[in-house]
């Protein structure tokens, strides 16, 4: 079954993408939750016309994301956490703490755009992935230190 995504769906696609999904996933989850519509011929024509009209807007959004990515390349983050005597963190470091540190540096990023591949439970250096645009993905190094 082909559907047109109405919003970004993790591990599936981005808004206005035409993707193939299993029938049950499309009918029981994506379409009822208003995350997608069935990709009929008329829906595809409407999508093509909308995309033609949005080309300039999308180029500006991509340019802004690239500018932000260039700005973020020079930023290094240090996150303080309470630790035990042998360097293990009480709790863990999540995308919320990274978004807060970026906000302190003057860069507002939604925490949904930040992903960390591993669970951070110890002091050390790590990398977080920021998905600023569907074509622009950068890694930001950060260090976890004891408070």
UniProtKB/Swiss-Prot annotation:
InterPro entries: Ribosomal_bL9 (IPR000244), Ribosomal_bL9/RNase_H1_N (IPR009027), Ribosomal_bL9_bac/chp (IPR020594), Ribosomal_bL9_C (IPR020069), Ribosomal_bL9_C_sf (IPR036791), Ribosomal_bL9_N (IPR020070), Ribosomal_bL9_N_sf (IPR036935). The keyword RNA-binding applies. GO terms for molecular function: rRNA binding; structural constituent of ribosome. The keyword Phosphoprotein does not apply. One of its GO terms (cellular component) is ribosome. GO terms for biological process: translation. Keywords: Ribonucleoprotein, Ribosomal protein, RNA-binding, rRNA-binding. Pfam families: Ribosomal_L9_C, Ribosomal_L9_N. Coiled coil: none annotated. Binds to the 23S rRNA. Belongs to the bacterial ribosomal protein bL9 family. PANTHER family: 50S RIBOSOMAL PROTEIN L9 (PTHR21368). This is Large ribosomal subunit protein bL9. It comes from Azobacteroides pseudotrichonymphae genomovar. CFP2. The gene is rplI.
């Amino acid at each position: 079954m082909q559907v047109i995504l109405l919003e970004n769906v993790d591990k599936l696609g981005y808004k206005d993408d035409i993707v193939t999904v299993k029938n049950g996933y499309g009918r029981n989850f994506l379409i009822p939750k208003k995350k997608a519509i069935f990709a009929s011929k008329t829906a595809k024509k409407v999508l093509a016309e909308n995309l033609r009209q949005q080309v300039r807007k999308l180029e500006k959004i991509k340019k802004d994301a690239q500018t932000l990515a260039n700005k973020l390349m020079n930023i290094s983050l240090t996150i303080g956490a309470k630790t035990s005597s042998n360097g293990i963190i009480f709790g863990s470091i999540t995308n919320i703490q990274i978004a807060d540190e970026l906000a302190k540096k003057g860069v507002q990023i939604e925490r949904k755009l930040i992903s960390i591949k591993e669970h951070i439970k110890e002091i050390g250096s790590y990398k977080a992935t920021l998905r600023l645009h569907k074509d622009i993905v950068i890694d930001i190094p950060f260090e976890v230190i004891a408070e």
